[in-house]
Amino acid sequence: MKFSENILISPYGKSTEKGLMFRITNRRDTTLLETSAQLIATTSYQDKNGKMKRDFARLNLEISEIKMFPSLWTVVHPIDEESIFAKHSLEELIKRNIEVLVMIKSHDESYGRAVYARTSYKGDEIIGNAKFKTSSLLNAEGELTLDIDTIGKFVKL
């Protein structure tokens, strides 16, 4: 599997809403089944005694599991009032050493085994006010093609 290099805060849903999103592509020759994603945000803070601590927050996903994963999936955390990204500015979260941990689990039917992938995005890899460029095109025969080298390309808004 290949992950986008960055995770973006992008327009999402209604005009005033935003989502935290990254892309993942299946680089295998086989279709993966029952693919699930989990995101956890972790930040540092100083407690009342001056001791450094870590906070962990599970990030809700628009879709946490897809039954069939043939090519590309944009995983989206809708930023609602419960999200750490709504409660703190991106600058604040970067100061608190935010890291978004990503865990993917899937089933490779061809080999009959579980497939796991993981990555993380640190503060400097979180891009605010941006959106991903299109990675799929229709070829001359009208078939949908995916350029996996462009899954992480984005534009600032």
Locate each region found by the language model:
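Canonical alpha-helical transmembrane segment with a positive-inside/aromatic-interface signature
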Residues: 1-51
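Generic structural motif
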Residues: 6-11, 27, 42-44, 64, ...
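Short, surface-exposed linear segments at secondary-structure transitions and domain or protein termini
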Residues: 43-46, 60-72, 121-135
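Noncatalytic linker/hinge segments flanking ATPase motor cores
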Residues: 46-48, 62-67, 80-82, 140-149
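Extended, solvent-exposed segments with strong compositional bias
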Residues: 53-94, 106-113
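Extracellular Ig-like/FN3 beta-sandwich strand-entry sites
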Residues: 95-99
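Intrinsically disordered, low-complexity polar regions and short flexible loop motifs
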Residues: 101-103
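Acidic, serine/threonine- and proline-rich intrinsically disordered appendage/tail regions
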Residues: 110-157
